[in-house]
Amino acid sequence: MSDTVDIYDDRGKLLESNVDIMSLAPTRNAAIQSIIMDTKRSVAVNLAGIQGALASGKMGGKGRQILGRGLNYDIVGNADAIAENVKKLVQVDEGDDTNVIKVKGGKSLLIQSPKSRIIAGADFMSATTVGAAAVTQTIMDMFGTDPYDAPIVKSAVWGSYPQTMDLMGGQVQGILSIPQNNEGLGFSLRNIMANHVAAISNRNAMNASALSSIYEQSGIFEMGGAVGMFERHQLLGLAYQGLNANNLLYDIVKENGKDGTIGTVIESVVRRAIEAGIISVDKTAPSGYNFYKANDVPKWNACAAVGTLAATLVNCGAGRAAQNVSSTLLYFNDILEKETGLPGCDYGKVEGTAVGFSFFSHSIYGGGGPGVFNGNHVVTRHSRGFAIPCVCAAVALDAGTQMFSIESTSGLIGDVFGAIPEFREPIKAVAGVL
């Protein structure tokens, strides 16, 4: 495990050789920068949802309906004309990078605002606000809505905003949550629901973990956690856990996939770390127990990060259930520490995250399944980008055991953003620009 790696895809196919990990940094890699920019400038619009809200008077969230104020507008049937006009309103200059695409036969739209709108703002919300405003104006103009009914159209698109901070009950949705929901500085790219990531990747576990790793590590860069010596530390984790560097993740999963356990994954990780000279025996106790030392601490952390994800793929894959991801994060690292005498992934922060995660995801509290958590959540934000990729992988492998399914929370996001190749297959995208 040198700082020059080979990048492999989710099928173990070599994509790019002799890659300097520094070229994988969000500050340098063009594909990662494109993913981040497209994340900020893109929103999904549920045209079928708008049509249903207008017809029923149901808007602004659950339990809210204004009887007698329905509008029978054929929104889906006019999707082409709506898309054309929305593009004219959203674009800054003729022929710029504005993009408006019909999805699912006109039931949804993907609106990508031009980069100039994002650059001209202090945050990323202009994609949502401009997109929602353009759709609202287009519908009112197209159907000749009078001032009396205009608020109904606005509420069908925008939901209960501005009475609520977010567009609750609205039909315009981005990958990112609103900035007001962030737990601290630089958390925007980490405030993405695991279900969203799994939906975008079409439930491909390794691509889900890769996309999540890109978001998480980019967030660490944004919050100042990858400065100086910590940059190498984070990039090694991104390369090996997120981008299958040297095919290590794929090989360990393949080795343990048939009848492996968390314990056998630990054996695979420790053996490879010893063979690569990353760790070596420091001293031997009278009992014969070996205490190891890390000859390269960030590389040992990368090994632990790969192992944590591999154990998740093996364990959650065997059960086809996401619920055991929290216990996998916990006990893989707990046993790894006992096996080596070295800290687990992220120096105990993944293990610590898993303790609270177990309680809040399905223990006696049990308020939500793993898929609704993110790297901004008060329970799961504590790891520096190494826990949530495992959660996204587990959710992708889930066969329908979650209380909050991918389809119920992230159907629109998956349909719209999953149509963008760089989101759906991020490993290939990153390797493709090297």
Curated annotation (Swiss-Prot):
Any idea where this protein resides?
Cytoplasm
Where along this sequence does the record place binding of coenzyme B? G367
Keyword Transferase attached = yes
Enzyme Commission number(s) of this protein: 2.8.4.1
What's its top-level EC category?
transferase
Q: Which UniProt keywords apply?
A: Cytoplasm, Methanogenesis, Transferase
Named cofactor requirement(s)? coenzyme F430
Question: Where is it mainly found?
Answer: cytoplasm
Source domain of life: Archaea
Q: Does the keyword Cytoplasm apply?
A: yes
The pathway it acts in is: One-carbon metabolism; methyl-coenzyme M reduction; methane from methyl-coenzyme M: step 1/1
Any idea which positions bind coenzyme M?
Y365
Per the record, what are the reactions this protein catalyses? Answer: coenzyme B + methyl-coenzyme M = methane + coenzyme M-coenzyme B heterodisulfide
**Note on how the cofactor is bound:** Binds 2 coenzyme F430 non-covalently per MCR complex. Coenzyme F430 is a yellow nickel porphinoid. Methyl-coenzyme-M reductase is activated when the enzyme-bound coenzyme F430 is reduced to the Ni(I) oxidation state.
A single GO BP term for this record reads: methanogenesis
The UniProt entry, under InterPro entries, shows: Me_CoM_Rdtase_asu/bsu_C, Me_CoM_Rdtase_asu_N_sub2, Me_CoM_Rdtase_bsu, Me_CoM_Rdtase_bsu_C, Me_CoM_Rdtase_bsu_N, Me_CoM_Rdtase_Fd-like_fold
Among Gene3D superfamilies, the record links this protein to: 3.30.70.470, Methyl-coenzyme M reductase, alpha/beta subunit, C-terminal
For this UniProt entry, the molecular function terms from Gene Ontology, in alphabetical order, are:
coenzyme-B sulfoethylthiotransferase activity
Q: Which family does it belong to?
A: Belongs to the methyl-coenzyme M reductase beta subunit family.
Question: How does the annotation summarize its subunit structure?
Answer: MCR is a hexamer of two alpha, two beta, and two gamma chains, forming a dimer of heterotrimers.
Briefly state the protein's biological role: Component of the methyl-coenzyme M reductase (MCR) I that catalyzes the reductive cleavage of methyl-coenzyme M (CoM-S-CH3 or 2-(methylthio)ethanesulfonate) using coenzyme B (CoB or 7-mercaptoheptanoylthreonine phosphate) as reductant which results in the production of methane and the mixed heterodisulfide of CoB and CoM (CoM-S-S-CoB). This is the final step in methanogenesis.
What is the protein name given in its UniProt record? Methyl-coenzyme M reductase subunit beta
Gene behind this chain? mcrB
